[in-house]
């Protein structure tokens, strides 16, 4: 891929230095990023050797992963989990969303990139082959945006191509950017899914200030579906400010332009946060903190249950009207599922395939 000046300008506004561990030096992804950025580089043995004053998001840290490459979505106690699998490629994000849960545990951390993609690809293949009787979903957007830094390292293409011949596997790259051009020419896309986290433009402007506009994300979605990819969308978090219903229903209408058969799933999740994140959000005086929230069984604060039921039912019903996609709620209780969707996901034809447990 030709590395455009636009990307170089974008990344050099974010980073001003690179740290790299010795065991990551030989990887082509590392060499490519270092050459493209032309920033000062320091070799270290581990993250512990990064200078204290550089422990922030202006530092790009390139390394090999330690421990398991593929993990289960962490889930939360007494809330239904969709058995999604995750791979950490890019850890950390600079898009600056006010509600981001990563603020509670990555606040003083460099953006970390794990360049050894062959190990997780092989592990994912084994898991999928061990679960031939069910669909396996795996993605890279759990602890960072899947595509924000991908034009620099180009690792998502390795996953898409390396997993393309596995029929029961969906590999998902989730983003709030429009950085998809480097993926469009891949010939064998298999069941690759490019997904977009979306919110009404009013929320984007006030709470996702470093992310890309709703229009830019939807324009990127049009590009990838034209190139042959599957799509997914994530309304997460839904923020219930005044006028929320009309704003979210208007945003849902914008999805009607995409082929129904190409949207594989849509998730909805209302705003939630652990106690330590509340303290960080409070420092910025976000207006949504003045709404009514209650601590739930998993320790996170959520809107009152009666309000969540109302939100989920209205958005769920409208999405069911305009799409054939599987629509599910992220980290919600049986009670909310039964009210908003009429049953729990394991008993609904549209979602049963999403919620089957994955074997080893």
Map each language-model feature to its residues.
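Structured alpha-helical segments in the cores of large, soluble enzyme domains
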Residues: 124-130, 182-187, 214-227, 315
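Auxiliary Fe-S-binding modules of radical SAM enzymes
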Residues: 1-26, 256-360
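Hydrophobic faces of well-ordered beta-strands that scaffold small-molecule active sites
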Residues: 136-140, 171-173, 194-196, 231-235, ...
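Cysteine-centered iron-sulfur cluster-binding motifs in ferredoxin-type domains/subunits
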Residues: 87-97
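Conserved Radical SAM active-site core
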Residues: 63-81, 98-197
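Conserved radical SAM core fold
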Residues: 144-147, 178-181, 192-212, 237-241, ...
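Flexible, acidic/Gly-rich N-terminal and inter-domain linker regions that tether
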Residues: 1-83
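Catalytic cores of alpha/beta
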Residues: 243-258
């Amino acid at each position: 891929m030709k590395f455009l000046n636009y990307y170089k300008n974008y990344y050099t506004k974010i980073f001003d230095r690179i740290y790299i561990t010795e065991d990551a030096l030989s990887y082509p992804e590392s060499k490519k990023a270092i050459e493209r950025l032309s920033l000062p580089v320091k070799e270290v043995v581990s993250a512990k050797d990064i200078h204290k004053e550089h422990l922030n998001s202006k530092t790009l840290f390139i390394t090999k992963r330690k421990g398991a490459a593929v993990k289960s979505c962490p889930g939360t106690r007494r809330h239904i989990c969709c058995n999604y699998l995750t791979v950490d490629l890019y850890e950390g994000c600079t898009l600056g969303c006010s509600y981001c849960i990563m603020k509670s545990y990555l606040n003083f951390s460099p953006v970390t990139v794990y360049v050894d993609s062959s190990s997780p690809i092989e592990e994912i293949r084994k898991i999928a082959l061990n679960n031939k009787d069910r669909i396996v979903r795996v993605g890279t957007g759990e602890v960072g945006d899947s595509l924000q830094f991908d034009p620099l390292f180009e690792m998502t293409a390795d996953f898409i191509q390396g997993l393309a011949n596995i029929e029961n596997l969906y590999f998902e790259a989730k983003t709030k950017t429009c950085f998809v051009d480097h993926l469009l020419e891949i010939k064998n896309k298999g069941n690759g899914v490019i997904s977009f986290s979306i919110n009404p433009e009013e929320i984007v402007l006030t709470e996702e200030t470093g992310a890309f506009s709703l229009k830019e994300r939807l324009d990127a979605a049009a590009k990838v579906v034209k190139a042959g990819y599957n799509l997914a969308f994530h309304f997460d978090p839904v923020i219930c400010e005044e006028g929320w219903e009309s704003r979210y229903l208007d945003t849902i209408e914008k999805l009607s332009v995409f082929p129904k058969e190409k949207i594989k799933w849509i998730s909805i999740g209302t705003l939630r946060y652990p106690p330590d994140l509340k303290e960080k959000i409070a420092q910025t005086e976000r207006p949504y903190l003045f709404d009514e929230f209650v601590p739930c069984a998993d320790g996170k604060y959520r809107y009152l249950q009666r309000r969540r039921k109302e939100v989920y039912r209205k958005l769920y019903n409208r999405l069911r009207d305009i799409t054939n996609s599987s629509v599910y709620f992220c980290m919600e209780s049986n009670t909310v599922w039964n009210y908003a969707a009429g049953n729990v996901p394991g008993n609904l034809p549209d979602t049963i395939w999403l919620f089957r447990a994955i074997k080893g």
